[in-house]
Amino acid sequence: MKGLIVCVCQGTCPSFQKMNVFEVVNYFRRNNKVDFAVIHPQLCASDGDNFWRVLLGKQELIDKIVVAGCAPEMQKKMFGWVFKELGFDESKFVGVEIRNMTTEEAIKAIENVL
């Protein structure tokens, strides 16, 4: 399975103002480009850690997870420890930055890593 998680920095970050995150997620769902799609308010918070624990509880089903949000380097720094804790193969993780993009720009950036 291939999944898309869009992290929106609580939904109040000015860097997401030009984008309709629902249109982004629905584009990938409607066009069958991913097997599942999720909008998470803040993956770097403690409930984000819990989200990863639940999602990766069935990690053998996951071929690729794309997280669209902040800088990929920051994502690896924030999620790396939980991936290690759960024994998740980090080569299946791809981070893509979509801050300060329009809806169309975000879709293109995500398509480039899928």
Predicted regions and their residues:
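Iron-sulfur-associated redox domains of electron-transfer enzymes in respiratory
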Residues: 1-114
